[in-house]
Curated annotation (Swiss-Prot):
This is Visual system homeobox 1. Residues 127-151, 262-341 are annotated as: Disordered. The NLS interacts with UBE2I. PANTHER family: CEH-10 HOMEODOMAIN-CONTAINING HOMOLOG, VISUAL SYSTEM HOMEOBOX 1. Interacts with UBE2I. A motif (Nuclear localization signal) lies at residues 147-151. The gene is vsx1. One of its GO terms (cellular component) is nucleus. The keyword DNA-binding applies. CDD domains: homeodomain. Residues 148-207 bind DNA. It is found in: Nucleus.
Length: 341
């Protein structure tokens, strides 16, 4: 008999432990699950491989080697591949058995260590390439964002001149004014809006020093100083004398009755001094006297007109009486003259 026939005849010699029952519901492709805690039990290997000596040793091909490997016989010449199989071989191998090497198994020969390492290197390379691609994409996106943020417009002298003129006219131009500037300067409207924002920030920063504050600060600070008769700093007065009227409030140091001059005049004669009170009382007395004289003169004029009216009426009455007294004799004379005739 050949080695193949011996392997076929020896199929029913494989036995199972009677203490472990087979659960058909838990049957898997890898084996059966048991209740033990050994490595073979945890890995699902419940069959005990019985050692068997090869018969004549005539099988020189691969099938004969697989049937009589290390003193163990396998049914059908098939070799179960797995960690449990290797562990069972190591545990049940007799001391006189030859050394077990993976090269003895033809199914394990393609999966050598070098091939496994090559596969790992390929996987690592593929993973690293994906990471590099994703990192490059992220870097590209970040660089695009940075480029957009760092994009700056270079203005020409003509554009700056037009923008400065518009800024002196109005610090907050409307949409129509910005569109007109865009047509003049050939700039986009959003660039003009950003330029005005930066220009206002620069102006506010420069106007923070004395005499260059904003309008609210001028009306608040200088108004309080004028109300309380606080002298202004010499720097502002000197700048106004030197002609730097743009550096201070024009209504504060202007020629036509500036508030600073008024505050100086009030400061010379403060309202709490006796001179100022005397002058105020004297002016009030004069005003009262003038009003009294005007009222009395008006009353006297009215009385005179009434007296004149009364006198005129009395004279008219007297004249009428005299005419009545004189009229009868005249009538008698006329009657006498008529009779004589």
């Amino acid at each position: 008999m050949t080695g193949r026939e011996e392997a076929i005849d020896e199929k029913p010699k494989v036995k199972l432990y009677p203490s472990f029952g087979i659960d058909k519901a838990r049957l898997n492709g890898s084996g059966f699950r048991s209740k033990g805690f050994a490595i073979t039990d945890l890995l699902g290997l419940e069959s005990d491989l019985q050692p068997h000596q090869s018969g004549s040793g005539a099988g020189a091909n691969g099938e004969g080697q697989s049937a009589a490997l290390g003193g163990f016989a396998f049914p059908g010449g098939s070799l179960p591949i797995g960690l449990g199989f290797l562990c069972s071989l190591a545990a049940q191998q007799p001391p006189g058995a030859p050394c077990f090497l993976p090269s003895h198994i033809p199914l394990l020969q393609p999966r050598t260590e070098s091939h496994f390492m090559q596969n790992l290197e390929q996987q690592r390379d593929a993973y690293s390439d994906d990471d590099c691609l994703s990192g490059d994409r992220n870097d590209g996106k970040n660089s695009q964002k940075r480029k957009k943020r760092r994009h700056r417009t270079v203005f020409t002298s003509h554009q700056l001149e037009e923008l400065e003129k518009a800024f002196h006219e109005a610090h907050y131009p409307d949409v129509y004014a910005r569109e007109m500037l865009a047509m003049k300067t050939e700039l986009p409207e959003d660039r003009i809006q950003v330029w005005f924002q930066n220009r206002r920030a620069k102006w506010r920063k420069r106007e923070k020093c004395w005499g260059r504050s904003s309008v609210m600060a001028e009306y608040g600070l200088y108004g309080a100083m004028v109300r309380h008769s606080i002298p202004l700093p010499e720097s502002i007065i000197n700048s106004a004398k030197n002609g730097m009227m743009g550096s201070c409030a024009p209504w504060l140091l202007g020629e036509p009755a500036g508030m600073h001059k008024k505050s100086l005049e009030i400061g010379k004669n403060p309202p709490g001094t006796p001179e100022s009170t005397h002058s105020d009382s004297y002016s009030e007395e004069h005003k009262v006297k003038d009003s009294d004289t005007t009222w009395s003169s008006g009353a006297n004029g009215a009385d005179d007109s009434e007296d004149m009216a009364i006198d005129l009426s009395s004279t008219s009455k007297q004249e009428s009486k005299s005419t009545l007294k004189r009229s009868p004799p005249h009538t008698e004379d006329s009657s006498d003259s008529e009779t004589e005739s």
